[in-house]
Amino acid sequence: MKPSPQRTLIKKLLVLLGPLVAVPLLFFGPEYRCLFSIIFLSTYWIGEAFPIGVTSLFPLALYPILQIVPSKQISPVYFKDSIVLFMCTLIMAMAVEATGLHRRIALKLLTKVGAKQPVMLLGFMCITSFISFFVSDTACTALMCPTAVALLMSMSDAVQHLKEDHRKPKPPPDDATVAEKLRIDDMTPQDAGFCKALILACAHASLIGGTAIITSTGPNLVFRENIHKRYPEGQVTMTYLQWMVFAIPPMFVYLLASYIILVCYFMGPSTFARWFERPSKEEAHLKKLIEKNIQTMYEDLGDVSWGEKSVFVFFILLIGSWISRDPGFTPGWGDLLPHRNFISDSVSGVLISCILFVWPKDPFDPIDPMAPILKWTDMKSKFSWSCTLLIGAGYAISEGVDKSGLSRLISCGMKNIFVGMSSLPLQLTVTTIIVIMTEFASNVSTGSIFIPISLGVAESMGVHPLYLALPTTVACSFAFMLPISTPPNAVVYDTKVISMVEMIVCGFLLNIACILITSLNMNTWTYFIFSLNIFPENIVISSENSSYPVC
């Protein structure tokens, strides 16, 4: 999608004026110089003055020059343990894509769901969110959006066949948008609404699914890194399994809220009433045609290949190793090792990732039986280096916020503002602020700034750190309103099926629902599971360490 001249001009002005307005901050202390660097980075990310990955490297130069963090301390931040873990998930996602396993799983489940529009929408959202457990939200949307378009095209062909309209419509031009290819303008309001709901559901479900697993998305990894760094003696812990216990139950409620909003907005509330109605003869015929098309798409994939089976087994081994290393309620395989502190989740991730580069994709191929599932050329062409560097920049921002004292400054300011406020209104306020911020900044940068701050605010107010940090982390993924908020939104908006107003309205309603659901979860299920009414022992609050603010 080529940007308009007006948008290009606005971006150039933003890139020029943003840092210029913040220049006075350079004449104050390190915390204000750190704030300048954050404004500089945010402006360049939003304005896209450089590629996102290139902008993400600026902290390596800005922090030493502005005397915020020495170069030797900021450079290793870009290759933390959590970064390695994220790289392993991206490599596994590449293997899934290389073998076509994701498409087989999606189509197989859709053959079981059926072709009734409301049921298909719900089934597609569940499938997308499940895939997003283990694949980044951007990759998940990029994988599932074409699948959704293929399903909609098959439905459109089935409708034409049902009408016995054998006149071939004028083929769309090569540069036609998805909306033009689907001929949405010629559809009934119900069918057009279903198309819009299914396309937008790709973004919603992938973002929601990313909240379920601690390795799924950047803010979750930022949270994990902050917990490990801030509480090295285990005063506060969060294992892979503990996160699932916290995040999966509300994820289903987020998904249900998104489903209800999409159906009501695009298809009308009466759709739920029609769910239980007996279909007409024409509707039953159409349903059979669509199901037949889906079945044909699945059969065209052929038998399950050796590569698909191999990736599936490695996938299960990887997830199993993460869950069983330190389950929390019982000793894991990590406890069997003499030096358990030497092992983290990235170890099994690296081992399996390396195997994927030598394991044969098809040992029965007469031409090249030893061709591996992944090649190094895939790392050069398909690996998301920009996303990896973006998360590294997020950790760099977090390091600068901590070392410069900006975390303490903001924490004390927030404490003074929220003094006398009870814990529930405080939590709702913080979550709402994060949701607003993440609509205009990347979820990683938002999390990198506010997760350590939320931990500091909670400690300084005598509240369990997880009570504010968990909703802060999850809220970073609630970027549903704008195309610039997150890449999944940009992917679905680029289809031209969804208008800006439709995305904003649905996203706004879903944001409100997610804030309320998160608060309900934190004050019921999570409050009980993690004993959030008890402040952890052995948390040392020292004025000499900016990580533990004393106001």
From Swiss-Prot:
- Pfam families xrefs: Na_sulph_symp (PF00939)
Report the main location listed first in the record: membrane
Example GO biological process: sodium ion transport
Residue stretches spanning the membrane: 9-29, 34-54, 82-102, 119-139, 194-214, 243-263, 347-367, 417-437, 449-469, 497-517
Q: Which domain of life is it from?
A: Eukaryota
Membrane topology (UniProt): Multi-pass membrane protein
Q: Where in the cell is it found?
A: Membrane
Which key words are in the record? Ion transport, Membrane, Sodium, Sodium transport, Symport, Transmembrane, Transmembrane helix, Transport
PROSITE patterns linked: NA_SULFATE (PS01271)
What's any one GO cellular component for it? plasma membrane
**What are the recorded GO MF terms, alphabetically?**
citrate transmembrane transporter activity; succinate transmembrane transporter activity; symporter activity
Tell me which InterPro entries the record gives: Na/sul_symport_CS (IPR031312), SLC13A/DASS (IPR001898)
Signal peptide annotation: none
Family under the similarity heading: Belongs to the SLC13A/DASS transporter (TC 2.A.47) family. NADC subfamily.
Q: What does this protein do?
A: High-affinity sodium-dicarboxylate cotransporter that accepts a range of tricarboxylic acid-cycle intermediates with 4-5 carbon atoms. There is no interaction with monocarboxylates.
Specify the protein name.
Sodium-dependent high-affinity dicarboxylate transporter 2
Source organism (scientific name): Caenorhabditis elegans
User: Gene encoding this polypeptide?
Assistant: nac-2
